[in-house]
Amino acid sequence: MSVRLQTTTLWYHPSQQHDPERVFGNPRYEGRTPSYVIWNLLERYTREGDLVVDPFCGGGTSIDVAAHLGREGRGFDIAPSRDDIQQADARSLPLEDDSADFVFMDPPYSTHIEYSDHPDCIGKLDAFEAEYLDAMDGAFAEAQRVLKDRRYLAVYVSDTFKKKRGFIGLGAELYVLLKRRFRPVDHVAVVRGNRKLEKPRFHKTAAEDNFFLRGFNHLLIFKQERGERAR
């Protein structure tokens, strides 16, 4: 597979890994971020030696890609899965103001995955409740604090649907929160390479019960512009 920069706002990653000769992130970590997405972001918005920060580091894909590209990756998680990921709440990072050159976030999309038993885990908050959005706004405020002026932030998130509760457009909800703090750059749809989407029984259930399977993730790209009102 020849890896290349995406040039439209519709991305498709044919594999979890952008480099078939390497493994980026813990392959056993549920809900891990495709390295292809992070590679595209870092190639566009960072330079060699830049500090890349991931407050929801999970399986460590972001810091592995950062290291491969010659960037300094610092990963944080409420429940670290690796020794090179530091324990911290995304709402309170042990970083100085204006220290990060790029911030990447792949936060929990509600309670679909059991991430940890930590009482402060945002993954325990139901996205249908106000507490989830309050927590995410706290994480965005912290990103605003640590991100340098004129540098970029990207948030990778999926909408959510639950039977008997309905649909919540997390991409739209988080966009509104981010726009209060940063300047919008672009909004990319990333086609989900999910094996469940290849199974006929899931499509049969979706058709019979009249709902849609999540076919893409939102990639929300913003820029820090201190002293200028986001617009």
List PLM regions with ranges.
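Class I S-adenosyl-L-methionine-dependent methyltransferase catalytic core
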Residues: M1-R231
